[in-house]
């Protein structure tokens, strides 16, 4: 892809598209679901689907939509109240999406995910199959974080990160992030002299960009959107960031907003999952020689280079690889459980019994944090 117009054309003609809608785009000033706003969005989504686009909607707004009926003037800060608001808002939001798409004879399917669903490969695959089957049955998947059962603070960032992960899970050709901002600026667009950034080819284009916080109803903020866009880019998915007001043009020609180019050295599906979605079940501490071997020479990790094992993990679990300075240098899938590894620490392969001579982490099942660092501006 040599030109910005090429990337925008790819987004405009994507056969499989993820569209994320922000909280503020779905509610009125009182924090209640806005049927007119949802109809406007559904109209634009339907126009794109009429072009044979396979479309997945990531809809924020459950907590925001529950605030009005529960008479909450401010977005709740404690987890229990957030979950209560989400439990009310999810029902109202799903009803409105169903009503609006029914005007076109379409059925919706609600897919509620948590961060732990993405972290476990089997659960991630189940979510992937559910989304795929909904599309095969001509239903519109409406994806949201399952805020009501989250056991930790909601960490997807107004579903921006969730949209990036869904783009990866669904093998999307492009992702559109919609909110109340028309694109990326080098500072708060309300400030004099703020410069619009039309395209982001790499993290170098983000140097000096100051991203603000989320609004009253949302939790994302521009920083979360940029991070999510770069995350999707690492999976090879181009991203368009713009306002919901521009949804028509965004889904038609993509000649609006900020365009994030996909990385040319896209990560494999497995390495992407390991770096950005999987939970770590433990840590392997490496000596300097092992760090050099796995990060610079792309070699497998052998037991002789391990100085310490932390955590209680099973064979094929994902673990962090930690250097002598305490910094995590990568992640990988272990060939042995933690109990067995304690007996292998520091031993040369030739000194081990035959059944224990496999690499502790094979190079094919390892991903380095140098890849992850590319997300940072």
Swiss-Prot record:
InterPro entries in the cross-refs: AceGlu_kinase-like_sf (IPR036393), Asp/Glu/Uridylate_kinase (IPR001048), G5K_ProB (IPR041739), Glu/AcGlu_kinase (IPR001057), Glu_5kinase (IPR011529), Glu_5kinase/COase_Synthase (IPR005715), Glutamate_5-kinase_CS (IPR019797), PUA (IPR002478)
Principal EC category: transferase
Residues binding ATP: 20, 179-180
Gene3D superfamilies xref list: Acetylglutamate kinase-like (3.40.1160.10), PUA domain (2.30.130.10)
A GO BP annotation: L-proline biosynthetic process
GO cellular component: cytosol
Places the protein is found: Cytoplasm
Pathway annotation: Amino-acid biosynthesis; L-proline biosynthesis; L-glutamate 5-semialdehyde from L-glutamate: step 1/2
Keywords attached to this entry: Amino-acid biosynthesis, ATP-binding, Cytoplasm, Kinase, Nucleotide-binding, Proline biosynthesis, Transferase
Catalytic activity from the UniProt record: L-glutamate + ATP = L-glutamyl 5-phosphate + ADP
PUA domain sequence ranges: 281-355
Main location group: cytoplasm
Assigned EC number: 2.7.2.11
Coiled coil (residue ranges): none
Residues that hold substrate according to the record: 60, 147, 159
MF terms in GO: ATP binding; glutamate 5-kinase activity; RNA binding
Family membership: Belongs to the glutamate 5-kinase family.
HAMAP family: ProB
Name under which the protein is recorded: Glutamate 5-kinase
Lineage: Bacteria, Bacillati, Actinomycetota, Actinomycetes, Mycobacteriales
């Amino acid at each position: 892809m040599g030109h910005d117009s090429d990337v925008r054309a790819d987004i405009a003609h994507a056969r499989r598209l993820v569209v994320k809608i922000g909280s503020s785009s779905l509610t009125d000033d009182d924090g209640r679901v806005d049927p007119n706003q949802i109809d406007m969005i559904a109209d634009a989504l339907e126009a794109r689907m009429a072009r044979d686009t396979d479309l997945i909607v990531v809809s924020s707004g459950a907590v925001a939509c529950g605030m009005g009926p529960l008479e909450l003037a401010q977005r709740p800060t404690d987890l229990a109240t957030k979950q209560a608001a989400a439990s009310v808002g999810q029902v109202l939001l799903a009803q409105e999406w169903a009503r609006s798409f029914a005007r076109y004879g379409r059925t919706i399917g609600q897919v509620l995910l948590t961060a732990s669903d993405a972290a476990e490969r089997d659960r991630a695959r189940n979510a992937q199959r559910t989304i795929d089957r909904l599309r095969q049955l001509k239903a519109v998947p409406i994806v949201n974080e399952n805020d009501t059962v989250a056991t930790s603070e909601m960490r997807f960032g107004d579903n921006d990160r969730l949209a990036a992960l869904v783009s990866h899970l669904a093998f999307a050709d492009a992702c559109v992030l919609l909110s109340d901002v028309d694109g990326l600026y080098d500072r708060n667009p309300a400030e004099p002299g703020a410069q619009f950034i039309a395209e982001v080819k790499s993290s170098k284009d983000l140097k000096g960009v100051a991203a603000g916080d989320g609004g009253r109803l949302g939790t994302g903020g521009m920083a979360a959107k940029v991070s999510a866009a770069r995350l999707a880019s690492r999976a090879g998915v181009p991203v368009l960031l713009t306002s919901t007001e521009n949804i028509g043009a965004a889904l038609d020609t993509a000649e609006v907003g900020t365009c994030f180019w996909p990385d040319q050295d896209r990560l494999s599906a497995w390495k992407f999952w390991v770096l950005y979605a999987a939970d770590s079940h433990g840590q392997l501490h490496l000596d300097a020689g092992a760090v050099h071997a796995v990060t610079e020479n792309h070699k497998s990790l052998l037991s002789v280079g391990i100085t310490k094992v932390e955590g209680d993990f099973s064979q094929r679990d994902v673990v962090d690889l930690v250097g002598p300075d305490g910094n995590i240098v990568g992640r990988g899938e272990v060939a042995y459980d933690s109990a067995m590894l304690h007996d292998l620490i520091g031993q040369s392969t030739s000194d081990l019994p035959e059944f224990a001579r496999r690499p502790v982490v094979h190079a094919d099942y390892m991903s380095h944090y140098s890849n992850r660092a590319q997300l940072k501006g």
